[in-house]
């Protein structure tokens, strides 16, 4: 963890790693009596080498480390969506994002939701029975 002083308030704040926050989320969900499923981040609309960029060496790695440690179900939305965007193609995928490379349009959000449904079915989640 790191301690930072906030510019406006001058108060100090402790900031933990991404993995720490994932584990905290999992713990909080279990404490509420629910069953967590980790879902990775959506891919960015960046296309080095003709394919949508995968971030499996940073966020993807951190998700997998937490999943290995906690044995929580993991839906790899990042790669499921990136694979489908590769098939759609770089030019057409521009319609799925707003003006930046991170935030999707409504069309992109709907596409990502379909990818979540596909992932839930593939992992044989109990939630899959509620999907079309």
Regions from the PLM with identified roles:
Residues 1-106, 110, 114-132:
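Alpha-helical cap/lid subdomain in secreted, periplasmic
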């Amino acid at each position: 963890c790191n301690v930072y002083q906030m510019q406006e308030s001058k108060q100090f704040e402790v900031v933990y790693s991404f993995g720490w926050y994932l584990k905290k989320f999992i713990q909080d969900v279990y404490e509420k009596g629910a069953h967590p499923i980790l879902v990775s981040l959506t891919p960015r609309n960046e296309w080095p080498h003709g394919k949508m960029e995968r971030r499996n060496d940073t966020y993807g790695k951190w998700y997998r480390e937490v999943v290995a440690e906690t044995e929580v179900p993991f839906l790899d939305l990042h790669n499921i969506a990136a694979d489908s965007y590769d098939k759609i193609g770089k030019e057409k995928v521009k319609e799925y994002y707003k003006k930046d490379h991170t935030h999707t349009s409504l069309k992109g959000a709907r596409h990502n939701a379909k990818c979540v449904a596909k992932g839930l079915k593939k992992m044989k989640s109990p939630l899959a029975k509620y999907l079309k």
